[in-house]
């Protein structure tokens, strides 16, 4: 168990100063360098005399200087707001307007001119590092102080800043490094793929820094080159893979993504979206000896609140894979529309309680009051997810409340339809979306389909392919759930965080 993130990093700077903490295609930085660089950057930040505990926006990609700046800000007593280099200018402006940061640190060239907020450039960070300024920690982030603030997409289009405290982070990190499901080794060698602006990134950097491991990052230029990206990943000595399931699906398009070519890769950690039976089955075929961990949780409950090791037996017997045993310190409940706790097996909304629950959304008391509350004397959060608990306290996922539609008198989970279609042996990926009429009622269901390699060539017309897919799933899919139209694509759009972008597809079919 660790009691302070920075104390842990500082300890490794003493005991394994020359061990790499960061590796980008062979360009390495050690724990000793991270201490010296973060001390120097923290001294620079202190010299600016910012308002105590005020948040600082950090703009950049998956670089070492981002990591060193995050550590420096924690030492200096400031929460950091990670903003990815690929963010749209409108989103950056919205984040600045809401967060009111006292400073912007631009590790990459900042695309906007902001009046009234000082900006520190990469050249100033580099100069501070060269100066090697000593630093005495007297006011670092502690306890309920905000450690980081990650902005998620709001339903109104306005992003919401989720405040995660040092205590929240410790609750998550200690669970992850101690829980048998994750089985994190000492000095873990982790792939650092999800951007820092996505809280899934915490699942790789927090346990790695807590256990003295190495982060293997990829340069941003590589991420846009699909073929080169996965050729490079296959050559990395990573032992643990952390990503959304969608990113793993992309990786499996490369023949090099297999146990024979990547023998060091033994653990897969998934979070951020639902892990399908189809993806898990394919992964077991590629990596027969690997451990596949399915984790679940919203950003508001610090990355994940439950986890479970997926077995071949689960893949063979479940239509939707379980999402885990809740964390011991985070009692999780299922409630009905009136807020009453439901019994085992009953489906309702998943709520999470305990020390990993955020204090709320930054400078947004209205949205905070809607989502955060007290349950059984504990801080609690409405996940907006449908689920149930088995008698063995395993959490089962049933979809999103906001992706639940009423069609032809039936209440339908869009994700349930997608899961059923994904069971077809011809389908690589499927997403169900509703088309609305002028009265905003569901007119019909459509499905976006990516078929497996070689499937299209077996059919003369798409109509015949559609009939074949429908026939392949009709035995386990209710007729009223079957989409009336299938739209075939070579790929499905992903959000910057690597999830399938369902909202974009819904907007597309409704001409929004």
Curated annotation (Swiss-Prot):
Q: Give me the residues that bind ATP, please.
A: 152-153, 294-299, 385, 397-400, 499
Query: Which sites bind D-alanine?
Result: 199, 303, 499
What name has this protein been given in UniProt? D-alanine--D-alanyl carrier protein ligase
Q: Known InterPro entries for this protein? A: AA_adenyl_dom, AMP-bd_C, AMP-bd_C_sf, AMP-binding_CS, AMP-dep_synth/lig_dom, ANL_N_sf, DltA, DltA-like
Q: Which family does it belong to?
A: Belongs to the ATP-dependent AMP-binding enzyme family. DltA subfamily.
For this protein, the record's PANTHER family field holds: ENZYME, PUTATIVE (JCVI)-RELATED (PTHR45398:SF1), PTHR45398
A GO molecular function annotation here is: D-alanine [D-alanyl carrier protein] ligase activity
Which reaction does this enzyme catalyse, per its entry?
A: holo-[D-alanyl-carrier protein] + D-alanine + ATP = D-alanyl-[D-alanyl-carrier protein] + AMP + diphosphate
Indicate yes or no for the key word Manganese.
no
What processes does the entry annotate via GO biological process terms?
A: lipoteichoic acid biosynthetic process
Gene name per UniProt = dltA
A cellular component term from Gene Ontology for this protein is:
cytoplasm
Pfam family name, one? AMP-binding_C
């Amino acid at each position: 168990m660790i009691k302070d993130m920075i104390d842990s990093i500082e300890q490794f700077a003493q005991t394994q100063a020359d061990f790499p903490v960061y590796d980008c295609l062979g360009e390495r930085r050690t724990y000793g360098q991270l201490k010296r660089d973060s001390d120097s950057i923290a001294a620079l930040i202190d010299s600016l005399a910012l308002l105590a505990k005020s948040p600082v926006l950090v703009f950049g990609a998956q670089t070492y200087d981002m990591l060193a700046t995050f550590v420096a800000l924690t030492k200096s007593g400031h929460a950091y707001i990670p903003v990815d280099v690929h963010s749209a200018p409108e989103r950056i402006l919205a984040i600045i307007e809401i967060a009111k940061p006292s400073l912007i640190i631009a590790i990459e060239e900042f695309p906007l001119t902001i009046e009234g907020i000082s900006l520190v450039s990469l050249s100033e960070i580099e100069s501070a590092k060269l100066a090697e300024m000593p630093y005495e920690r007297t006011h670092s982030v502690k306890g309920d102080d905000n450690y980081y603030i990650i902005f998620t997409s709001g339903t109104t289009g306005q992003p919401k800043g989720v405040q995660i405290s040092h205590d929240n982070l410790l609750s998550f990190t200690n669970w992850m490094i101690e829980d048998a499901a994750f089985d994190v080794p000492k000095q873990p060698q982790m792939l650092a793929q999800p951007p820092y602006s996505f809280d899934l990134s915490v699942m790789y950097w927090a346990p790695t820094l807590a256990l003295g491991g190495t982060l293997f990052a990829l340069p941003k230029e590589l991420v846009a080159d699909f073929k080169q990206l996965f050729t490079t990943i296959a050559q990395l000595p990573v032992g643990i893979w952390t990503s959304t399931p969608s990113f793993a699906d992309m990786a499996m398009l490369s023949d090099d993504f297999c146990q024979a070519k990547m023998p060091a890769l033994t653990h897969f950690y998934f979070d951020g979206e639902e892990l399908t039976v189809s993806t898990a089955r394919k992964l077991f075929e590629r990596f027969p000896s690997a451990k596949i961990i399915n984790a679940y949780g919203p950003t508001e409950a610090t990355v994940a609140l439950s986890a479970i090791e997926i077995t071949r037996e689960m893949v063979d017997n479940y239509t939707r894979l379980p999402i885990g045993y809740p964390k011991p310190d985070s009692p999780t409940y299922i409630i009905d529309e009136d807020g009453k706790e439901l019994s085992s097996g009953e489906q309702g909304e998943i709520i999470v309680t305990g020390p990993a629950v955020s204090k709320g959304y930054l400078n947004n008391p209205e949205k905070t009051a809607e989502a955060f509350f007290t349950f059984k004397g504990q801080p609690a959060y409405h996940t907006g997810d449908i689920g149930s608990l088995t008698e063995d306290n395993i959490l089962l996922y049933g979809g999103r409340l906001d992706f639940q539609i009423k069609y032809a008198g039936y209440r339908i989970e869009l994700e349930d339809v997608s899961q059923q279609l994904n069971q077809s042996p011809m389908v690589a990926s499927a997403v169900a979306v509703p088309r609305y009429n002028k009265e905003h009622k569901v007119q019909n269901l459509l499905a976006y389909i990516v078929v497996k390699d070689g499937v299209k060539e077996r059919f003369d017309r798409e109509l015949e392919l559609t009939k074949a897919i429908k026939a392949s799933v009709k035995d386990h899919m209710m007729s009223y759930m079957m989409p009336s139209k299938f739209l075939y694509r070579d790929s499905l759009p992903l959000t910057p965080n690597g999830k399938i972008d369902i909202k974009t597809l819904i907007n597309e079919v409704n001409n929004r």
